[in-house]
Amino acid sequence: MRRGHHEAQVLFERLGSQLGHRTRRTWTRQHPTDGVWLLDTPHLGLDEVPLAALEVVVTETGKALRGSITTLEMVSPALGILLIQDREIRRGLIRSGTSPQTATEHLRRLVAAATADISRSRQRLALWTFDQLERRTQLTLNRAA
């Protein structure tokens, strides 16, 4: 697991806990996610319901992107979050010799492709960047302090 992947998981878990949700790193073995917030519903005869699920994209391939979207659709949370770990992807591209300008353009195309793929889903999916996750976590933690 890449560092950026783990960073996103930790922040998502922290945000969910701060919002009062029970959290797990993954949904099930058959449908592994990178994080999930759970809604306990024993009064409905259900053990737990996935309130939000996270899939972190740390590679720049369209195949990986579509695989993450499919995982979110199969889990079927109230909100599926596809997180583009832009910092990790950018670091990897630049480390492999890509210029910063080309890396920025590559990320722009990846976000555009993710937006298009999400728009075709029948699930409620949101596209976040790592910066957006980090900011939401900071705002929630500051509000609680």
Show the residue positions of the predicted features.
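Long, low-complexity, intrinsically disordered polar/charged segments
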Residues: 1-6, 43-44, 50-51, 110-117, ...
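Hydrophobic, Leu/Ile/Phe/Ala-enriched alpha-helical segments that form helix-helix packing faces
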Residues: 8, 12-23, 97, 107, ...
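Catalytic cores of nucleic-acid endonucleases
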Residues: 49-115
